Amino acid sequence: MANQMLGAMVNEHYGSEGLLDRILTVARETGIEIDEARSDDFSAVSEFHIGGRKATIDLGNMAQLSAGDKVLDVGSGLGGPARTLVEKFAVLVEGIDLTHEFCLVANELTRITGFSDRAVFSQGNALSLTGDSEHYDVVWTQQSCMNIEDKRRMLSEAYRVLKPGGTFIFQEVFAGDREGAIRLPVPWARKSEMSFLWPAEAIRNSILEAGFIENIWKNVTTQYLEEYRVTAEKTRDSMQSSTLGVHLLLGNEAKLMRKNVVDNLSKGLISVYQGVFKK
């Protein structure tokens, strides 16, 4: 599929006019003082990956991030993980995302929570990074590769912009051990044309072929499955009670999408891995 066509599909899937207003309206209704908001006040909507904010912190610890590290967050979404990394590890983050609306919301939530001097977001493409070669200490991605068809090119770009000795760290959804079509819709795709899930070992080999050295390769499917099952149930409750949640960006299908993720994980059709690799 042509990159331009896929990009349009991704923007249509995730993009939602008025998203910022919806988030702030619901935040106020739930008692959040916007002028005093903290990063974790928005985590239910801005860290909607499997494992949520806890998984972000786990990854940061796994990567042994250091204060002042320059981090490129590929597929930065609403900026939740970036703000968590800034808050917990004192790093500097540049986030890129294919979805224009996400970047607008990410920058505003970052301003509101007081991290604008340490995290900034712009529209960009993982297949053609604008950063200089050997510029970043860390390239970070959490569940953005499912929408990327040309994964080898993405890995090549990640390798290019990393400094020698830099760290590539990820949490991603891969194909599971059981063959078969996944149940749709899921949070990253309403149609099969948007979902590109490779087997874990194929990804692992491609990372090594790109030049990276493996430090950690970890199947965390079981670790996060039950937790995500609870999260999926809470999605229904948050939709009914007008609290912050992924339904604000994915709409009325959010509950079904998360239920399908649980089903796909339980049946072995998809898996979740974390990895740390060095350049």
Region spans (language model):
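A short acidic, Gly/Pro-enriched loop at the edge of an enzyme's catalytic core
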Residues: 127-138
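Short alpha-helix
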Residues: 195-211
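Conserved alpha-helix/loop element of class I SAM-dependent methyltransferases that forms part
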Residues: 49-67
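Conserved Class I S-adenosyl-L-methionine
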Residues: 216-279
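A short glycine-rich, Lys/Arg-flanked "PGG" loop and its adjoining helix->strand segment in the class I
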Residues: 152-167
